[in-house]
Amino acid sequence: MVKPIYLDYNGTTPHAPEVIEAMRPFLESEFGNPSSSHWYGALPRQAVETARRQVGELLGCPAQHLIFTSGGTESNNHAIKTIAGSLFARGTHIITSAIEHPAVLEVCRFMEGHGFSVTILPVDENGLVDPSDAAAAITDRTILISIMHANNEVGTIQPIAEIARLARQKGILVHTDAAQSVGKIVTQLDELGVDLLSVAGHKIYAPKGVGALYFGPGVQPGVFCHGAGQERGIRAGTENVLEIVGLGKACEIAAANLEQNAAHMRTMRDRLEEGLKSALDDIKINGHRVKRLPNTTSVSFLDLEANRILEKIDPVVAASAGAACHSDHVQISHVLQAMQIPERWAKGTVRFTTGRMTTAEEIDRALDAISAAVRELRR
């Protein structure tokens, strides 16, 4: 069976071969508990700390400012819930944006039910947050701003450094969900200036079920999971050594080849976009033209339904929809709604995302399949 061309790298990524090899000993022989003081615990303990250093080198931060989690969702929950909880006496106001991942928006909704108020910032037609809107939303009760670094649907990269600068002037902490940006663009913490940053392993060719949370100097995250005191007493539970090793190796690879990989993904993305624009009328590329992830293209096909397009191309191309079309209504993603994309365009939005393994031959075959499907649906 020939597998479809994979163009959903923002959804998840395949395991890099080097990641699989790095993890192999911890599947086959190195089963020890890293908390054990005997011989069997020594190598797993060393492997966890090596991985912590590898993640830190990609982000440009000391290893001691990182804890391992089960992924981006847990990191976001931890960053918002425990920090907000620890600062409750100082303030109860959180600022976020309308295009955040549910792993941030749903946490903020949870906090609203526990004594906090939340301001949701709008975005422009390109999906950008205006830092002046963030500044205007700050009150004397604001304790945390959580804005994603790059959007998972349209790829728009937010002005996080500028938002962090204005927040710092007011003594407000800033968290960024960097699940989509880590490994694709520069995420050096000295440039971003944030206090907390979330990482998701499965977006960077590491396994699902592992991630990391950075917390900056002076930031004291509360205990998220009580128990035997692993991860500096912040997140108890025996470490998932196998997947932590995989995350570390993935970060090492990303750090070594960041520019090269970004250039390749951008070339493949641009080949797809230019091909679609040449072959088809009435299409629109969503997101910022320049401030956009190098691998991400969100394409709206006028007066078509995304799920119909995906059904047509499914044997050849794997991608994802920006709108779910049901028999009686169209459910447009909250991101496209926030960008105020007209329904005639939004309902036909498909996200294609390239990766390190995408080839020009795959893009050309995908172009043929997508173009043929759209033409057939428009007859």
Spans of features found by a protein language model:
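Pyridoxal 5′-phosphate
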Residues: M1-R379
